[in-house]
Design a protein with these regions (language model features):
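Structural recognition of the beta-strand scaffold that forms the well-ordered cores
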Residues: 30-32, 92-97, 120-123
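Short, conserved, surface-exposed binding loops centered on an aromatic residue
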Residues: 21-23, 84-85
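Alpha-helical segment that forms one wall of the substrate-binding/catalytic cleft
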Residues: 45-82, 87-105, 109
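Long, amphipathic alpha-helical surface segments
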Residues: 1-9, 14-20, 26, 35-38, ...
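Substrate-binding/active-site groove segments that recognize
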Residues: 23-49
Length: 225
């Protein structure tokens, strides 16, 4: 099972897009679309500080890393739930896990697995620390229970050399642009021309040369008196 397009867009909207490393609300060094060292490479500590010189390239890299990360979280959510999930439930659960990393220890998941869906939905709101995530938890709770996806804004935020988010848009993506970035599987190195396609002219084989030889011979013989 995979997160739907609507689920991915909602998750990206919750996380925000930051084209360089920054400290989140609890002091974890983060980059791109909520990417941390715990999720795997690249380590945000190794990325250049501040705004990149090529913003579009950084955005493409952010989406590449996000696609890499989301597979890990999808697999862990599938493993944590013992009962079937609808698409909206799965999308909400992956969003929760992407933010908290605690799908295996969350009480609401155990409650859901025991068969008490209503109580599980209520318990989602036990995860509201820091307070900044309260609105996100409410949106995930609504998505899980009612299948209503939140209205989204896909903002690329500015970031300072001191690794702080500057809440001024550097760019705003449309849903269509974001989905295209998610679908694009072409490595950046290919796009940037690091790998070029070389056209090789085939060497004529004897079979392909023979008609030319015969044609020339007939013309020669036909022209003799």
């Amino acid at each position: 099972m995979q997160v739907s397009d609507k689920g991915l867009i909602a998750l990206i909207s919750h996380e925000g897009i930051v084209p360089g490393p920054y400290y989140d609300s609890v002091g974890v060094l983060t980059a791109y679309i909520g990417h941390t060292k715990a999720a795997g490479p690249p380590d945000p500590a190794t990325l250049p500080w501040g705004m990149p010189s090529d913003l579009d390239k950084a955005i493409k890299e952010a989406f590449r890393v996000f696609k890499q990360d989301i597979k890990k979280y999808e697999a862990e959510v599938i493993k944590a739930f013992k009962k079937p999930l609808t698409q909206n439930e799965f999308d909400a659960a992956v969003s929760f896990h992407y933010n908290t990393g605690k799908i295996h220890s969350a009480a609401w998941v155990r409650t859901f697995n025991s068969g008490n869906r209503a109580a599980a939905i209520e318990q989602i709101m036990n995860w509201t620390k820091p307070i900044e995530v309260t609105a996100r938890r409410q949106a995930e709770q609504t998505l899980f229970s009612l299948g209503i996806y939140p209205k989204t804004s896909l903002t690329v935020w500015q970031v300072s050399p001191s690794r702080k988010v500057i809440w001024k848009p550097a760019k705003v993506l449309t849903t269509e642009e974001a989905l295209k970035l998610l679908e694009d599987e072409t490595p950046l190195s290919v796009k940037e021309g690091e790998k070029k396609t070389t056209t090789v002219t085939p060497t004529p084989t004897p079979a392909s040369v023979l008609p030319l030889i015969l044609s020339s011979l007939f013309k020669f013989l036909g022209g003799r008196k």
